Amino acid sequence: GQSDLTIERELDASQALIDSLNEHGVDLGEITRNLESEGVVKFEDAYNSLLDTIGRKRAQYVDDLKDLAEPVRSAVKKAAEGVIVKRLFEHDPTFWTQDVNAFDEITNRLGWLGLPEKQFAFLPELTAFRKKVEGLGFTNAFVLGMGGSSLAPEVMSLTLTPQAGGIDLQIIDTTNPDEILARLEGVDLTKTLVIVSSKSGGTSETNAALQYFWKLYEDLGINDIGKHFVAITDPGTSLEVMAREKGFSQTFLAPADVGGRYSVFTTFGLVPGAVIGVDLQGLLEKAHMADLRS
């Protein structure tokens, strides 16, 4: 067959056919009213059935919670009597164990507690870095990182509204060549900042991505490649050394006592946040307020 716009053809004949239906006992008005009333009834029945199902499910879930009431009350009472929140924020290792041999390891993992308040002092440096990025004319940025080193920037780029002056940010947390090529499509590398992010400094996937991106700039014949690269890592890592040797534009060091999953308020989250134009002052204020309320 052949598709064609036929609805506008022979309009007079179509109207005459419709008019003739009454002569054969077909009342289109009545048919329409019946269909409408039946449709409303069916919709109402379906809606009421849905509400009944939700009601039964709710009753079931509420009933299931009864068994949790006493354990929750007991846990809250225990937390209050043990001054748990206070001990946690004081980095008290006895909250977890009485083994003195484990104290150092525990206290070296608690830097995330109260971190937002400490990072207010870092804001001037972040503001200066953002202006530097704008001054260099960068319009795009990549974060090369895995896990905690890239999750915070990804969440920020997807959920927070940037201020004026922010640039587009993409995450490279894969070694899949097709995906990397797709991310690079249409990107002007001469106007691109590459943020190499690794807490350990030795993440193999991140290092592979670094080598690949560095080679891209070499192939473009760019002399001062280092100005396109920034490193984020812990103090004393191989990445810190490499960044210095290769002449990276800047290296940001993160506190060693903050694990990757808590790194949103360390340089791993705040530096990319500055690049894309996140209101870091407002972000830290809200996080600090949450700390105070806890």
Please give the residue ranges for each predicted region.
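Glycine-rich phosphate-binding loops that contact phosphosugars or nucleotide phosphates
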Residues: 127-293
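A generic structural signal for short
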Residues: 5-6, 117-118, 202, 228-229
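Terminal amphipathic helices with adjacent charged low-complexity linkers/tails
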Residues: 45-82, 285-290
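Extended, charge-enriched "interface" segments that sit outside catalytic cores
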Residues: 63-135
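Flexible, acidic glycine-rich loops studded with aromatic residues
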Residues: 1-59
